[in-house]
Amino acid sequence: MIEMFTQIFIISALVIFGMALLVCLVRLIKGPTTADRVVSFDASSAVVMSIVGVMSVIFNSVSYLDSIMLIAIISFVSSVSISRFIGEGRVFNGNHKRHR
């Protein structure tokens, strides 16, 4: 009985995450501004991390958690880089001097 509820919960979670990912990808493609695309990319990476987490529960394996961490790091770095590019026009600051 409990296994049936668990299976229904996992399947419904995957369906909801799939619909959320579809909405995020539509906004990523059609987004009128770059900021919309950055936000939708960040949201879609969070949805992908959630899907991988559910798959980790399904397969009863902790090896998927490393990929969740990798997706989170790549998403954070890319969001910060694109936001700096939108704000300043460049990713790296070239106004620093080297100390010798």
From Swiss-Prot:
TM segment ranges: 5-25, 38-60, 65-87
InterPro entries given in the database record: MrpF/PhaF-like
Subcellular location field: Cell membrane
Disulfide-bond pairs as recorded: none
Single GO MF descriptor: sodium:proton antiporter activity
Pfam families hit by this protein: MrpF_PhaF (PF04066)
Keywords: Antiport, Cell membrane, Ion transport, Membrane, Transmembrane, Transmembrane helix, Transport
Main subcellular location: membrane
Bilayer topology annotation: Multi-pass membrane protein
Gene Ontology CC entries for this record: plasma membrane
NCBIfam families: PRK12657.1
Family per similarity comment: Belongs to the CPA3 antiporters (TC 2.A.63) subunit F family.
Subunit field text: May form a heterooligomeric complex that consists of seven subunits: mnhA2, mnhB2, mnhC2, mnhD2, mnhE2, mnhF2 and mnhG2.
Name of the protein in question: Putative antiporter subunit mnhF2
Organism: Staphylococcus epidermidis (strain ATCC 35984 / DSM 28319 / BCRC 17069 / CCUG 31568 / BM 3577 / RP62A)
Lineage of the organism: Bacteria, Bacillati, Bacillota, Bacilli, Bacillales
